[in-house]
Amino acid sequence: MKFKAIVIDIDGTITCENRELHLGAVKKIRILKVPVVLATGNILCYARTASKLIGLDGAVIAENGGAVTVRYDLNGTFEESLEECEKAFSFLSEYFKLTKLDPFYRKTEIALRRDFNLEKARTLLETQPFDVEMVDTKYAVHIKSTRINKGSGLRKLAEIMGLEAEDFVAIGDSENDIEMFEAAGFGIAVANGDERIKEAANYVTEASYGDGAVEAIEFLESNGWI
């Protein structure tokens, strides 16, 4: 079994607990001989900046799969519009005081501060015809299209790169990484990940956050899989 690339989440996976990039994980990623794609629920410019700081080529999946790009000098490909998300936001605003995060930069989804009852909001949303869902990344709650996720983003990016999604190992920590694990050939959850992502993983590290990412890569190397 040999994999051709790695797709890895940012926050909670290659960061410290305080969200700073984990220097050990960055160093490990820089010396890899396979392509590394960053995948995040955050905005495209954030993902590109992280890719640049780490020393990668700029291949990123942003906005939970809604935006992808393979190089810094190319415009991002956006897979959905905000129309349905805005309808859902307006509906939920009748019941909760919601605060948007990065509203001027997000093109395919709405991110909200995590200061409202998410389960109640999900229940209310189920009564409506909107083709959206709410995903908690532990850093924000995202209102996004049901057709878009990190898995669909990975398949799109893999196609552009001339690869299959199954050629990738996926590494992550949150429920928004589940579809990415399902699309990839192998999934690794870091120890601080939530229970749903651990259940979806093929392997769970003993270490957390960036230390877990280092452990994941060393596990792959020790098995000769990358």
Curated annotation (Swiss-Prot):
Q: Which cofactor does it need?
A: Mg(2+)
Sites where the protein binds substrate: K150
One term of GO molecular function: phosphatase activity
GO CC terms for this protein? cytosol
| Xref: NCBIfam families | HAD-SF-IIB, Pglycolate_arch, PRK01158.1, SPP-subfamily
- Work out whether the entry's keyword set contains Signal: no
Q: Does the keyword Metal-binding apply?
A: yes
What keywords would UniProt list here?
A: Carbohydrate metabolism, Hydrolase, Magnesium, Metal-binding
What's this protein's function?
Catalyzes the dephosphorylation of 2-phosphoglycolate.
Q: Where is the signal peptide?
A: none
Q: Which family does it belong to?
A: Belongs to the archaeal SPP-like hydrolase family.
Q: Where is the active site?
A: D9 (nucleophile)
Q: What is its EC number?
A: 3.1.3.18
Q: What is the designated name of this protein?
A: Phosphoglycolate phosphatase
Residues that bind Mg(2+): D9, D11, D173, D177
Q: Name one Pfam family in it.
A: Hydrolase_3
Please write the reaction equations for the catalytic activity of this protein.
2-phosphoglycolate + H2O = glycolate + phosphate
Q: What is the lineage of its organism?
A: Archaea, Methanobacteriati, Methanobacteriota, Stenosarchaea group, Methanomicrobia
